[in-house]
């Protein structure tokens, strides 16, 4: 009877009835994630379940190399070069204290080529302008010195600096037309000079080049657009500007922007024209994508 009275009282007062608890959705138990272990490829750790294999490092083919002190700078600071900076109404140029034809090319020309690695004023200006002056007046003295120029040229190209590469290519274009047989004498050294050109051959970026002074006779034989009437020297750090996917026909003030891919193509064509019958096959061996400008 007492139980019946309690049920009747609960029915009359539903608020007093005990509330049912709602069942929540069952949550999945947390799963412990193992700590990932970074490992090198082809090692014992790489076979573990929680290992993450690190990818291969970048090859760095286009990465610039650090510069080293050059012999040209040491000789210039010591005052061993018979040159001085001359100022006139047109700009700055080299004033030679002796006749260029009387210089010892075996001593001076390799030193000036060593200065191709320089990128600061006045070293870069004296080195590049001095090279073109000596090539213009060298004549028969250039060919015997050619083996001594290969290592400085190779060192300049191996810096992978776009500005230095462009200027070195212009120097090579001038070198092959500076005297007879120089182009043919360069053929055995293609394997030392051309590998870097093969890397940058398809690069399409424009770089500013300082204009230098060169005679019209030399300009008529090779594409040296950056050579002109004496202009103020400009250091590489001041003129280095990249314009991707733009041509080389833009001329701002006295600085000529050159496309590095086009410069390499022009240089290889100059090598083939002046290198004789064996030039093309040796170029093709190092630069497989090069197509002959004479056979086609």
Swiss-Prot record:
GO-annotated biological processes? cellular response to unfolded protein; flagellated sperm motility; protein localization; spermatid development
Q: Does the keyword Nucleotide-binding apply?
A: no
Q: Does the keyword Cytoplasm apply?
A: yes
Q: Where in the cell does this protein reside?
A: Cytoplasm, Cytoskeleton, Cilium axoneme; Cytoplasm, Cytoskeleton, Flagellum axoneme
What is this protein's tissue specificity according to the annotation? Answer: Expressed in all immune tissues, spleen, lymph nodes, thymus, tonsils, leukocyte and bone marrow. Expressed also in heart, brain, skeletal muscle, kidney, lung and pancreas. Expressed in primary Schwann cells and very weakly by monocyte-derived macrophages the primary host cells of Mycobacterium leprae, the causative agent of leprosy. Component of Lewy bodies, intraneuronal inclusions found in the brain of Parkinson disease patients.
One of the entry's Gene Ontology molecular-function terms is:
actin binding
One GO CC term of this entry? axonemal microtubule
Q: Which keywords does UniProt give here?
A: Cell projection, Cilium, Cytoplasm, Cytoskeleton, Flagellum
InterPro entries found in the cross-reference section: Parkin_co-regulated_protein
Assign the protein's first listed, main location to one coarse class.
cytoplasm
Q: Which domain of life is it from?
A: Eukaryota
Q: What does the annotation say about its assembly with partners?
A: Microtubule inner protein component of sperm flagellar doublet microtubules. Forms a large molecular chaperone complex containing heat shock proteins 70 and 90 and chaperonin components. Interacts with STIP1, PRKN, GPR37, HSPA8, TCP1/CCT1, CCT2, CCT3, CCT4, CCT5, CCT6A, CCT7 and CCT8. Interacts with MEIG1.
Q: What does this protein do?
A: Microtubule inner protein (MIP) part of the dynein-decorated doublet microtubules (DMTs) in cilia axoneme, which is required for motile cilia beating. Suppresses cell death induced by accumulation of unfolded Pael receptor (Pael-R, a substrate of Parkin). Facilitates the formation of inclusions consisting of Pael-R, molecular chaperones, protein degradation molecules and itself when proteasome is inhibited. May play an important role in the formation of Lewy bodies and protection of dopaminergic neurons against Parkinson disease.
Recite the other comments: Linked to PRKN in a head-to-head arrangement on opposite DNA strands and share a common 5'-flanking promoter region.
Quote the protein name from its UniProt record. Answer: Parkin coregulated gene protein
Question: What is the protein's species of origin?
Answer: Homo sapiens (Human)
Query: Corresponding gene?
Result: PACRG
């Amino acid at each position: 009877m007492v139980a019946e009275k309690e049920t009747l009282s609960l029915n009359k007062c539903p608020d007093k009835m005990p509330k049912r608890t709602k069942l929540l959705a069952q949550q999945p138990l947390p799963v412990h994630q193992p700590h990932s272990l970074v490992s090198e490829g082809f090692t014992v750790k790489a076979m573990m379940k929680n290992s993450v294999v690190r990818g291969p490092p970048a090859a760095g083919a286009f990465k610039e190399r650090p510069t080293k002190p050059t012999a040209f700078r040491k000789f210039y600071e010591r005052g061993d070069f018979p040159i001085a900076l001359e100022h006139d109404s047109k700009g700055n140029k080299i004033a030679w204290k002796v006749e260029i034809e009387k210089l010892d090319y075996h001593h001076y020309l390799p030193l000036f080529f060593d200065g191709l690695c320089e990128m600061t004023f006045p070293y870069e200006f004296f080195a590049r302008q001095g090279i073109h002056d000596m090539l213009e007046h060298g004549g028969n003295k250039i060919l015997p010195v050619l083996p001594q120029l290969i290592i400085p040229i190779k060192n300049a190209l191996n810096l992978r600096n776009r500005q230095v590469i462009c200027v070195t290519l212009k120097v090579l274009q001038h070198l092959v037309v500076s005297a007879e047989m120089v182009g043919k004498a360069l053929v055995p050294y293609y394997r030392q000079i051309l590998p870097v050109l093969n890397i940058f051959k398809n690069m399409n970026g424009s770089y500013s080049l300082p204009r230098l002074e060169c005679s019209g006779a030399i300009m008529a034989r090779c594409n040296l657009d950056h050579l002109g009437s004496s202009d103020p020297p400009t250091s590489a750090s001041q003129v280095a500007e990249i314009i991707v996917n733009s041509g080389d026909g833009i001329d701002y003030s006295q600085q000529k922007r050159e496309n590095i891919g086009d410069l390499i193509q022009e240089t290889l064509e100059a090598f083939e024209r002046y290198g004789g019958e064996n030039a093309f096959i040796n170029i093709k061996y190092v630069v497989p994508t090069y197509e002959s400008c004479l056979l086609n």
